C-alpha cells in the first residue's frame, strides 16, 4: 500500500496537466511525415510544466504527511529525495502521456478518441522507466514486480474515474 501512495505524484501529474494546460501547444500545429498532427492541441507546455509541478508538490506533501505520522504512509527518504523522486515520476508520467498521444496519432486515433490502454498505461510505464533510470534503488525497493503489476491493474479504473470527473467539471471534452 505504501508503494501505491508513493506513486500518487505520477497519477496526479496527469490531472495537473489538464488543469494547467491550454497554452503553448507542444507540436505548434506541425504534422509528422505521415501527414497527421504530431501530438495535437491537447498537449501543451503549460500542461506539461504545470503537471510536473503539481505532481512534485503532491509528492512533497506526501512526504510532509508521512513525516508527521512517523512514516505511516511510507517515505521517499530525505527531504531532497522527497522533491527529486516525485519530480522524476511526474516527468516520466507526462512524457509517457505524450508518447501515448504520439502513438495514437500514428495509428489514426484523433485527440479525444478512445485509445484504451494507450490512454492509461504509457504514463505509468514511463514513470516506472524514469524511476528505473534515475532512481533505481527506490524503484527496485518499491516497484519491482508485484507492486508494479498491481499499479498497472488499478490505473485503468482510476484513470477512467478521474476523466469522468474532469469531463463533468468541463475540463475535458470526452469522459475517457
Swiss-Prot record:
Keywords: Cell membrane, Lipid biosynthesis, Lipid metabolism, Magnesium, Membrane, Phospholipid biosynthesis, Phospholipid metabolism, Transferase, Transmembrane, Transmembrane helix. Its cofactor is Mg(2+). The chain crosses the membrane at residues 4-24, 49-69, 83-103, 115-135, 138-158. Its EC number is 2.7.7.67. Disulfide bonds: none annotated. GO terms for molecular function: CDP-2,3-bis-(O-geranylgeranyl)-sn-glycerol synthase activity. It is found in: Cell membrane. Its main location: membrane. One of its GO terms (biological process) is glycerophospholipid biosynthetic process. Pathway: Membrane lipid metabolism; glycerophospholipid metabolism. It is a multi-pass membrane protein. Catalyzes the formation of CDP-2,3-bis-(O-geranylgeranyl)-sn-glycerol (CDP-archaeol) from 2,3-bis-(O-geranylgeranyl)-sn-glycerol 1-phosphate (DGGGP) and CTP. This reaction is the third ether-bond-formation step in the biosynthesis of archaeal membrane lipids. Belongs to the CDP-archaeol synthase family. This is CDP-archaeol synthase. The gene is carS.
